[in-house]
Amino acid sequence: MSKQLIYSGKAKDIYTTEDENLIISTYKDQATAFNGVKKEQIAGKGVLNNQISSFIFEKLNAAGVATHFVEKLSDTEQLNKKVKIIPLEVVLRNYTAGSFSKRFGVDEGIALETPIVEFYYKNDDLDDPFINDEHVKFLQIAGDQQIAYLKEETRRINELLKVWFAEIGLKLIDFKLEFGFDKDGKIILADEFSPDNCRLWDADGNHMDKDVFRRGLGELTDVYEIVWEKLQELK
């Protein structure tokens, strides 16, 4: 399968394929935090992220969620549908943590009565600012119906993920999703789902996600390996 690099991101490289509607995503060993301010090469991270994300996307596909995932090609590669990414990070919070706790001056780990969905404008130059529905419409990123769909689909995905992670003894604190338009103009889930873009805590409150790297709490791949081993219990 011939391929040409079309985009190089913090965690993945994206390549063309012979089919204009398909791309290859190659997961890197690079770990970043604080919008790339903290950066490190960590051997084995790309393999683990690809394994975890491929597994989660396969389960989401099987549950009827429309995603860009087609198949896992190798240890670090997966085949995806090509999408036009919507420049929004859609964050869902089940518990207080991270920037939410800092913004509102509350402790981490407080259960939210209703999960909160937030939008962040994908723009590195602006440091991905927190925006509301009206900003989304002003920036002509999405209209009312599309905004409602993004929120509804994110909540639906959350209900699936919460159950799966609870079954393996992990609490889904929060996560970030990205969506895009497929060749038919349909909004589908894109990017990845791994400990890079979610927070997972075990029963003792230990961080099982990229906060280990952000906060210098231990070896990132050790934690990701535990998550991967636990996920395989769902098979």
From Swiss-Prot:
SUPFAM superfamilies the UniProt entry points to: SAICAR synthase-like
EC number: 6.3.2.6
Pathway where this protein functions: Purine metabolism; IMP biosynthesis via de novo pathway; 5-amino-1-(5-phospho-D-ribosyl)imidazole-4-carboxamide from 5-amino-1-(5-phospho-D-ribosyl)imidazole-4-carboxylate: step 1/2
Keyword list, A-Z: ATP-binding, Ligase, Nucleotide-binding, Purine biosynthesis
Molecular-function annotations in GO: ATP binding; phosphoribosylaminoimidazolesuccinocarboxamide synthase activity
Pfam families in UniProt: SAICAR_synt
Family matches, as CDD domains: SAICAR_synt_PurC
Reactions catalysed according to its record: 5-amino-1-(5-phospho-D-ribosyl)imidazole-4-carboxylate + L-aspartate + ATP = (2S)-2-[5-amino-1-(5-phospho-beta-D-ribosyl)imidazole-4-carboxamido]succinate + ADP + phosphate + 2 H(+)
Coiled-coil region(s): none
Single GO BP term: 'de novo' IMP biosynthetic process
Class in the EC hierarchy, top level: ligase
Gene3D superfamilies in UniProt: ATP-grasp fold, B domain, Phosphorylase Kinase, domain 1
Entries under HAMAP family matching the protein: SAICAR_synth
Family: Belongs to the SAICAR synthetase family.
Protein name per Swiss-Prot or TrEMBL: Phosphoribosylaminoimidazole-succinocarboxamide synthase
